[in-house]
Each structure stands twice: as C-alpha cells, then as structure tokens.
Amino acid sequence: MTAAYPPAEHMLRDLRFSFEHDTEGRASRAWLPVVDELCTDHGSARAGVLATLVDVIGGGLAAAAAAPDWIATADLTLHLVRAALPGSVVAANARVLRAGRTTVVIEVALSDDTDRMLGAATMSFAVLPRRDHNPDMSSALSDGPSTMAVETSRLRAPFLDALGVAVLDAAAGSIEVPVTDWSRNSMGALQGGLVATVADASAEVALREATGAALVVTDLQVSFLGFGRTGPVRAHADVLHASPQFGSARVEIVDSGADTRLMTLASASATRELAV
C-alpha cells in the first residue's frame, strides 16, 4: 500500500464524492454524481455503489463521533426504494443516532437532486482504542464542502470491472475480487463499501441464474466479521427465494489468501425493477 492515503488512483477519488461535515461532529453530508459506469444494465446506480457512499460518509461521521478513539464497522443495512439515474446527484445525509462508550450508530438518508427519497441506511460501529496509524478526523470538520477527487479522477470502466470482479460460477454466485491499492481502505483492507459491492454482485449473478430474470439488488444487510487484506476475496451465494419478480440470497465472503478466513456475511434482496 502506498504511503499517502488515498493514493493518486483510488476509488475514493474516481467516484468524485464531495463531503461536508458539521463542526460538532453530529451530522455529515456527501454527494455522488451518478455516471453510466456506476449503473446496472437497468440504467440506475448499483446498490453496492450506494452502499459505498453510505460507508464513506457514515464511517467518517462515526470516527468523528468516537474521537479521540477509533472505530471498526460492525454492520451496514441499505434499503432502496427508487432508482438513482445517470446525470443525477445522490445526496447522503448522515446523522449520529448514538455515540456511546462502546458503540456508534449512524443513520443515512439518500435522496436525489430533486429531493426525492431514494433509500435509507443504518450502520453500527465498535469503538476501539486509537492507534498511531489511525487518521485524525478533526481536520475534516468544517463548514465547507471538500473532495478527494483531482482533475484526472474518473471511472474508466464499469464499476465492477474497475473493482476486478471475475465470475467463477454464476449459479453459485461465486465471484473473485483482488485487493489492490485502488480498493484498499486506510487499514490496508478491502474498503467496506466495496465489500458490500461484492455481496451485491454475488447475489445478483446467483439470482439471475436461478430466475432467468434480470433482477437487481435493492436491499443489503452486511455484517463485517474481519478484514480482507490479502486477497483475492471470494464470495458465494445461497439462493433463499427465487421468482421472476423477486429473489433473496445469503452471501458469504472470505479472504482466500488468508486461509479462507470468513470476512463477511450478507443477505440481499433483488427485484425486477426499481421505481423511477
């Protein structure tokens, strides 16, 4: 991993997020411009992409709320009710629901640039003792928006291709993803929102194979059990329900380069289409 974080080419830059944090550390906002590369073949932003937005803004707010301690993500739940279309900007409004001695809980509301609700998410975090390598979040608290994008930052391929997703067995939802400098978090592991994207992709391919229908994931519940530092990260899905209109699946994600250690358990629901 490079010394500076994020490196010059990194998903945090290429997604062109912008952020704004209040100075009291109780609320944050983020904006994501939706481009074609972030969308499924239905033409709307992938659930994993929006989970990544939630993870980034929620994680930053949780770290500020837990200061001077640090945090580790325990779980993320996302529910989408409407499609986020190319050319729109998704706004994520995050607020602290609880900031205790051992736990921080964040709620994130998602809307488009016409203030239509797109979905909602919650995240919970374990509070940990600070270590020397943990970032100092106090510098992020300001009244003005900021971004990690630079002039050349942009996606040059569809999001799953940029992540390096390879389908090994569609029926089993078996996919493989490398852990690279582009996808690592500040701890040197696959970034949490990208782990959710792996769950999204695994469930999608399994449910499409099971139903013969072009279902898209609309709901994710992700429990983070460990880091994926070595890679490749591998996922497989067990289909729980499958019909032409709706499906659900359970997904396990392991770090195959670290004795196939279990990293994540997730559940996903998919439907034929989201409202526009």
Residue ranges and their predicted role:
Residues 1-276:
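Terminal targeting signals and extreme-terminal segments of soluble enzymes
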